[in-house]
Each structure stands twice: as C-alpha cells, then as structure tokens.
C-alpha cells in the first residue's frame, strides 16, 4: 500500500508541475525524499524546471542523475535548447534500449527532428 501511495503522490506532483503548482509539487517531492523515492524526486524536480521553461537547469541537474529512465526527459531538454549534437548522441544511446517505450520515444523524436 505504501508503494502505491508513493506512486500516486508522485503522479499528483507531476500533474502539479504541469499546472504551475511548483511549491506544492516540491512539498510532495520533499516527502518522497524522506521515503527514499529519489528517482521520483528527481523526476518531479526536472518536470518543475522544464514546466517553468528552465531547460538548461533541468539538463544540468538531470545529467548528474544515475537513473536511466530520466534520459528521455533530458533529450527533451536538449531538443528545446537546440543542442542537436547532444540530442543525436543521446538518441543513439537510447536506441540501444530493449524497452519498447524508449524505442517509441526515440522513433518519435527522430520523426520530429525531420520536420
């Protein structure tokens, strides 16, 4: 039950960042930090920075992360910052993933870059 609650709170915080409720999302992130949910905390922080348009800070913070599931978020930062070479390199790394969701993301980003 506790895990399920943590997941729900993380989802609420992410929705909050999308609705510019950054203080509230940060409070949830602090609580999740106390519960040892560091990946969720980092995702909430990245989302908050990105939703405020601070892609450079999000990328800088995210590049310090050890969670591979955050890589697509960093690719989005590179895309928004116009860092074509870094984005291409990241997409090439992500393309080696066996995760079909990552493959879908990579294919979608590559299509986006063609337009």
UniProtKB/Swiss-Prot annotation:
Phenotype when the gene is knocked out: The yscFG double mutant is unable to secrete the Yop proteins upon thermal induction in a Ca(2+)-deprived medium.
Induction field: At 37 degrees Celsius in the absence of calcium. Belongs to an operon involved in the translocation of Yop proteins across the bacterial membranes or in the specific control of this function.
Pfam families: Type_III_YscG (PF09477)
Gene that this polypeptide is encoded by: yscG
Gene Ontology CC: one annotated term: cytoplasm
Protein name: Type 3 secretion system chaperone YscG
Cellular location(s): Cytoplasm
Similarity-based family: Belongs to the YscG family.
Quaternary structure annotation from Swiss-Prot or TrEMBL: Component of the heterodimeric YscE-YscG chaperone. The YscE-YscG chaperone forms a stable ternary complex with YscF/SctF.
Organism, as annotated: Yersinia enterocolitica
UniProt key word Cytoplasm: yes
NCBIfam families registered for this protein in UniProt: type_III_yscG (TIGR02508)
NADP recorded as keyword: no
Role this protein plays: Chaperone of the type III secretion system (T3SS), also called injectisome, which is used to inject bacterial effector proteins into eukaryotic host cells. Along with YscE, prevents premature polymerization of the YscF/SctF needle protein within the cytoplasm. Required for Yop secretion.
Keywords: Cytoplasm, Plasmid, Virulence
